Amino acid sequence: MPHYGFTLAEVLVTLGIIGVVSAMTVPALMQNYQRKSYVTQLHKVYNELQQTFLQFKTDRNAINLREAGITSADTLNAMTMQYFKIVESCSDATTVEPCFENPSKYKKLDGGSARAFDNADSGSFVLASGAAIRPWLSGNDNNAFIVYVVDINGRKGPNVFGRDFFDMCVDVNGTVDTCSDKAE
């Protein structure tokens, strides 16, 4: 009588091959997913900032943010509290915790210290989306009228500048852009 089926050795070899292929592809898939998640969260925060400044100017019938009333850290914080969906406010300007992770844990892509919380004249906030923001009024009429330090996923890691942690500059007209070295 003929036997139909696979031997135990054939089944184990097949399962081993499936395991090796899975072990090689799953990390790449997870990394791809994480990157797309960061991009989506960054777009969400960017759009929220852009829409907020447009709404703020429209409500005050102003042509720019200075005319709309943003002239100090206090007015910037008040606008932030009124126009964003804030779930946590860290109003002590001398510390970023608990809205952000400890500043020493923020790094650049090369592993160096990020030093992004040098401004001590504004509070920090956690948005309903989970992003943490810290506005700073530089007062320049160039591309860095307001600088927002943004951690798109709040206190969660990796807390690396350029991955989940960014500076966003807002010009006096309310246009949001990357800062690069414009805030200097």
Tell what function each PLM region has:
Residues M1-P2, A9-V11, N61, L65, ...:
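Extended alpha-helical regions
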Residues Q31-L65, I70-N77:
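Membrane-proximal N-terminal amphipathic helix
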